[in-house]
Amino acid sequence: MAEQAKLPDQAQPVPETQVPDNGKPEQQPTATESAPAPEPATTEPTTAATAPSAVDGTGETAPAAPEPAAAPVAAAAAAPAPEPTKSEPQPAVGEQSEPAKKDEPAKPEYFTKTPALEQFFDRLPTILSNTGHQEMWGVPLKHEVTDIPTINVLIKFLRANAGDLKAAEDQLSKALTWRKENDPIALADASKNSYDASKFKGLGYLTTYQREGKGDLVVTWNIYGAVKKFDETFGDITEFIKWRAALMELAVQELKLDQATSVIDYDGEDPYQMIQVHDYLNVSFLRMNPNVKAATKKTIDVFSTAYPELLREKFFVNVPAIMGWMFAVMKVFVNQNTARKFHPISNGANLAKEFPAGVAEKFPKAYGGSAPDLESSARTVALKEVKEEKKEEPKEGSKEEQKGEQKGE
């Protein structure tokens, strides 16, 4: 038995010392002559040493050592040799897959931190396929783990639905469908669309204020006191929504979501949000125009679906303190998270006080800053002068002519 144990001991150096000499294996008539190593105790350590070498790809020759022994006796003496084989290259191969798995890229932290986000991301190809549209706020949505703008869009829809995956998927689908049908980017493109100045001039503006150490502060202004004829401005709800969406798209472009280089902290601050100001100076609240009510409700319905988590805060300025009921009504149509962002201010000149000094001074004077008025310092959508077609009034003929015409009939 000792002699039999010696053969695997000798087999270890065979690939290194005897492979160049092709004649030596034929000169070993017996296992006794071919096993000069005297200490059988080395068999087990040697076998143990070959297992890790198989993982590295170098131990695969150990089980093949008995093959060069041509004598049948050597083959018989090598009977214990299968034991290293039973140390099994297969498990070694299995072990080799473990380092391979470790080499795979680790799952992004934003997926491990928010499992629902990963599930939402996995559903994205189906959502895009079903809606037939892949653009959201200027971001081409991609099923790529490293595409940060796409991840941020998904985070906004998921946050807007308090982590409810089904609700987020449903809202994203509706928003994509709306964008496909209305093409809001084109609505904001001055080369493609412009809006009736007699209805919308002075009604909406956009300003962007630079902040030190932070991104730009984007503000949209809705000056309802500038409306001359409410029935004309709000009477055509479809036209009003298009104008309002065009203004919103200009603001979204200023957020630069498509250029994002960092993922939004799901539980933290979102830097890709804007401020909205609604000015009701000279607007009567005693009797709300029904067209205004209808347009307001439709705007809330569309924007709450198509533009979630883009609003940081909304200020209602120059609103009489007794008109608190208006905000109670608005809160019925928006979720609780959005409702918390509403801030009524009775005096518009106090608006700038809500912001840091470096930004506040850049506001127009009417709102507590030192900048010129919005008309001369802000941007707006493309407007056009639309000439009203004069309706020709029927000429009044003499009574005799009218009687003659009636008889002729």
From Swiss-Prot:
Residues 29-54, 62-80 have a biased composition (Low complexity). Keywords: Cytoplasm, Endoplasmic reticulum, Heme, Iron, Lipid transport, Membrane, Metal-binding, Microsome, Transport. Belongs to the SFH5 family. Residues 1-107, 366-409 are annotated as: Disordered. GO terms for biological process: Golgi to plasma membrane protein transport; regulation of exocytosis. It is found in: Cytoplasm; Endoplasmic reticulum membrane; Microsome membrane. Residues 98-107, 382-409 have a biased composition (Basic and acidic residues). Gene3D superfamilies: CRAL-TRIO lipid binding domain. This is Phosphatidylinositol transfer protein sfh5. Heme binds at residues 224, 244, 278, 280, 314. It comes from the Eukaryota. It catalyses: a 1,2-diacyl-sn-glycero-3-phospho-(1D-myo-inositol)(in) = a 1,2-diacyl-sn-glycero-3-phospho-(1D-myo-inositol)(out).
